[in-house]
A protein has these predicted regions:
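Conserved "landmark" site that anchors the functional core of diverse proteins
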Residues: 24-224
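Conserved short loop/turn motifs at secondary-structure junctions
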Residues: 1-4, 82-84
Length: 224
């Protein structure tokens, strides 16, 4: 509204809003999933000296493949989905792709393929289920990327520091994400099969017991 001609010129008149047609280019979070965050590639690097560890996608390859499929810039921000995914209502047309760990995907209750550019119509609801099998993170890329401010050179979320991404935290129900107005509606492209092969096995990751292993975070039984 504020960039509309009457306001931009500083000369609005009493009834100037009557003819204004406004279309929100937003995505509303109906449910957020286990932990869904905004991340970009290569992330926030080079700030260890001031106490900021690297931030960015855990599976940068999957996010980059999604951006490549949609024709996005390599550093376009997307959503990183951990274990279970969000339900999103689109208030504008969009083209999206889901890459990474296999996860159930539907639009308005109709199952949709992964690793494919999908046209989502305004008013539609996209739902992501729970990851099954190997892998823990999937990525939802949107044509043009998620619009959030850069912080220390990146849009990536750093939850412990509470900055970057959408308010420095994982998404919550009721959040509203902004995306660019869709100008290229081309959809249907798929990633080549050799670029989206499944993980061969579930791997064990060795960890060192640290301060976040204290009882207020994890019970002894859970650590075992």
């Amino acid at each position: 509204i504020l960039v509309d001609a009457p306001f931009a010129s500083g000369k609005p008149w009493t009834r100037c809003l009557e003819g204004l047609v406004y279309q929100a280019t937003t995505v509303e979070v109906l449910s957020a999933g286990t932990q869904t965050t905004v991340q970009d590639f290569p992330g926030r690097l080079g700030y260890w000296a001031v106490g900021v560890p690297p931030s960015g996608p855990m599976d940068s390859r999957a996010l980059r493949l999604g951006n490549r499929l949609l024709g996005n810039a390599a550093d376009a921000a997307g959503l990183e989905i951990t274990m279970s995914g969000p339900t999103l209502r689109f208030n504008t047309d969009a083209v999206v792709a889901v890459t990474g760990a296999p996860i159930p995907l539907s639009v308005d209750g109709i199952e949709q393929p992964l690793n494919t550019a999908l046209l989502i119509k305004a008013g539609s609801t996209l739902s992501l289920g729970t990851i099954a099998g190997a892998g823990a993170r999937s990525y939802l890329s949107l044509r043009g990327g998620v619009q959030v401010p850069d912080y220390l050179g990146s849009k990536s979320t750093f939850t412990l520091g509470q900055f970057g991404g959408h308010g420095g935290r994982a998404l919550r129900a009721g959040d509203v994400l902004h995306i660019p107005a869709l100008t290229d509606r081309q959809a249907g492209a798929q990633l080549p099969a050799d670029l989206c092969s499944a993980l061969p096995a579930v791997r064990e990751i060795r960890v060192i017991y640290g301060p976040h292993g204290a009882p207020e975070y994890f019970t002894p039984a859970y650590i075992e």
